[in-house]
Amino acid sequence: VAETVSKIKLANKPIPFPYRVHDQPDEDRLIPFVEFARKYGYHFQTKTPEQIANSFNEMLSKVQGLPEQRVLEQMGIRTMAKAIYTSKNIGHYGLGFEDYCHFTSPIRRYPDILVHRVLTSVLDGDPIVDKKMEQKCLHCSERERAAMETERASNKYKQVEFMKQFLGDEFDAVISGVASFGFWAETVDHKCEGFVSATSLLDYDDFIYYESEYALIGKRSNWAFRIGDPVKIKVISANLSKRQLDYEWILDLDFKPAQNKKKKK
């Protein structure tokens, strides 16, 4: 409430203000995701931003507790623009607010302080016109990204450190990412992500990356390694200095990779 009320105080005043904005989904990212979600039976209306938001909410509600929940949630997040701080208000698409800012939180951020200063000056009848507000917002956004990258690096380090004890062990996993040079898989038990190189798959087939399918597909076997697919992996390397986990795909006698549904041309 405080965050939206604070903006009302400034509604008709041309005062530089640190908004928290979130742009609409990028079409280039959205279309592949919509096609991917359709494979699981989820259909999107994309003519207007409101339809897109409603379709996302409907999917997120229906997918709860289903095997594809994690992959669709992760892929959905990746289609979204990143929220940033700026003095140029475009609204917050994700929250559905035309005007939004960060006022306070369990921790007090520097952007919160910027908001407090402007509001205090307005309430005191002597508004601050900070000509460097956009520069400060840019700095806040950059430091936020740096903090998130540091957090990811720290989490990855602890994952690698933890998985060192399991070298040579096999685990059930789920494919969490795919590229032309291999795929990433996250263990079901520990949520630790490692990489399976496409080179290590050459004994089985020559796999080609299909971006629209989010999949590596075998030339001869037509096997498909697709985001969200369950796999069996072996931990083969845990490099702390590089914060890197390497896995090897294990061909389970009771399991075969999914067959690609598209006919090969």
What is the predicted role of each segment?
Residues 1-189, 195-197, 202-204, 208-210, ...:
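Append "with occasional cross-activation on large, charged helical scaffolds in nucleic-acid assemblies
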